[in-house]
Amino acid sequence: MEKNRFTDTFRTQNTGKPLPLPIIDWERIGYTAPTVISGEYDGSSAPLPKADVVVITWTSAEWNAFDHVFVNSSSTRYPDDRDWEHAWHTYSRNIPSGMSTDNTSAPLWGLYRVIEMKTSKKKTIRVLLFKCDTHLAHPPYASGLEQITGQLIDETGCSWIWSIGTAGGSKESENLGDVVITNAGHIQLKLSENLSSGLNNKSVKGTAFPSTKLFSTVQKHLFFDMTSVVTWPVLKSMFDELQQKDSGAKSLTLNDLVNPPLDPKNLKQSKIVPADGKPLLTTDYYYIASGAEAAKWSVLEMDDAVIGYVAQQKKTSFCFSRNISDPIVPAKAKGKTIDDSIRGDWSGDIYSRFGFYTSFNGALATWAALTAM
């Protein structure tokens, strides 16, 4: 199965050990690691514990980096490390009769941990971290995603709900590894299972936006240096593999597919991009931007605006933190249109190879926003 933001919902297998995520030196920026709260679990059908903030993540790569930043930052973390997963608590409360998922490795609704964080104002906030296995583009579709969002808000009593994870770039200025933070979104649906939801073409915009005061410090001192994994030899190897699996790519060169947001010379320092009020685009299909057609969106992803819609109904503040795991892909080479299947494969390959590292940046950016509360 080709892996991308749409398909990466299954537990991944051991694939060897490439470069790990580093131990996080919180003291370097004058802070300490989040503290894990134990003894809060009464079984998968019990209500969720109370929390000030809920932070949701989605894919396997995102979840791995999420745990590393918020739970286990004192050791290195490889993409195929899995021992940490068993400490997460399953949550399956109030699943309607007949509601199911297409993913036997990740049953509804998902898994969680509870942590406490010290903020810059010397307050302590309690955060429920949630690995959501309920997706807009997979059964139980919009109805399931709306229900779990409502339960997360109602049971925790949170004042903020965040959704964080990987995203497609909407413009060439969004480099691989950058993180876009927004409080607005627009929903665009195609699946018949979702069209009856009444959510198609709905837009949301939050009234609150997080403080940005720690962003520059965190990106400078803690972000992953993408040039340590995105090199021309690595890109050449990926391109050779692309040509092997897609004969249409044989007419292309590597330079045809490496545009500015993927060029290693532009990736030394990833950045956090605040986008207060600029909507991301939420779809129930895998969408890769072409040219300037998607520039009006902050990023492209597949769940968030539904989270925001439910939160808005419940008068709960919401925010989205999306790391660029697959930048905008060139649409033409030497004046000729590049086939969509080639662009899709290349986008998926970039996500598969680098999404773990971009997700680390995304989780750190979220930590920075929460700590500045």
Give, region by region, the residue ranges found by the protein language model.
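Intrinsic-disorder/coil detector with helix-boundary
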Residues: 2-346, 353-373
